[in-house]
Amino acid sequence: MSFTVAVKEEILGQHHLSRHELSAIIKMSGSIGLSTSGLTLSVVTENAKLARHLYESFLHFYEIKSEIRHHQRSNLRKNRVYTVFTDEKVQDLLSDLHLADSFFGLETGIDEAILSDEEAGRAYLCGAFLANGSIRDPESGKYQLEISSVYLDHAQGIASLLQQFLLDAKVLERKKGAVTYLQRAEDIMDFLIVIGAMQARDDFERVKILRETRNDLNRANNAETANIARTVSASMKTINNISKIKDIMGLENLPVDLQEVAQLRIQHPDYSIQQLADSLSTPLTKSGVNHRLRKINKIADEL
């Protein structure tokens, strides 16, 4: 199950019915038609639970008995598509939800009453996500929440609602409609709180923390490996120089303070500078050991 599906299942599992949520779903996934008996309303979704949720909402709020139809897509995904259809009281429903325009279509913006009321805004965002929302799996490490809209002004309205909850929402216009999106992990987690998906929020945070911990460990391991590589490289250079000194002039001709360091470096090529300092007969600081090693390298370079 994808993370997006898990979020939607959590929301639908709460069995909350809301007119504002219904308004968002109809606006984003619905279409109005005309028949001999008047207006018809069709709402399309690939989510069977959402289709059932719509059926219950129509019945609960308007005593409308809708019909759930389904067919199989013919594209590569071959998903089952559900259409919740009704030709009962459509005009009354659209008027009550402030959805109908003067041309027997759906209003493209968001009603001011929703924009100005926090609880209405929460419910509307919940419906918008159920209809056309998606969240990239947090395991990917590339955080993105998107809500797609047919109309730019609706996408901007969604962004305004999100911004009222202090979320950094942006809008991107596309060839077919527009998308409102969040890219910060903290904003996505806060959005999940706004729509009441608390379990999904906790799951998102857990995955985020685990991933960041793994990344921190990897960075630490990489840094340690790089430090070891640098230590070995510097050690081998010094050992080669000590061998050169030994062959040409003999280690016994080095100053006494350099002889012990030279012998230790040859005996322990894997030692860090600190380990060399700790192994000297007279304790020395790391900078003191480095100074002596530089002297040895300089002597070798001059031979």
Curated annotation (Swiss-Prot):
Under InterPro entries, the record lists: Homing_endonucl, Sporu_reg_WhiA_N_dom, Sporulation_regulator_WhiA, Sporulation_regulator_WhiA_C, WhiA_LAGLIDADG_dom
Query: What UniProt keywords are attached to this protein's entry?
Result: Cell cycle, Cell division, DNA-binding
Protein family: Belongs to the WhiA family.
**Would the keyword Cell division turn up in this protein's UniProt record?**
yes
* Organism superkingdom: Bacteria
Species whose genome carries this gene: Streptococcus pneumoniae (strain CGSP14)
Tell me what this protein is called: Probable cell division protein WhiA
A Gene Ontology biological process noted in the UniProt record is: cell division
DNA-binding positions: 272-303
The record's function comment reads: Involved in cell division and chromosome segregation.
Q: Name one Pfam family in it.
A: HTH_WhiA
List the taxonomic lineage.
Bacteria, Bacillati, Bacillota, Bacilli, Lactobacillales
Q: Which GO terms describe its molecular function?
A: DNA binding
Q: State whether keyword Cell cycle applies.
A: yes
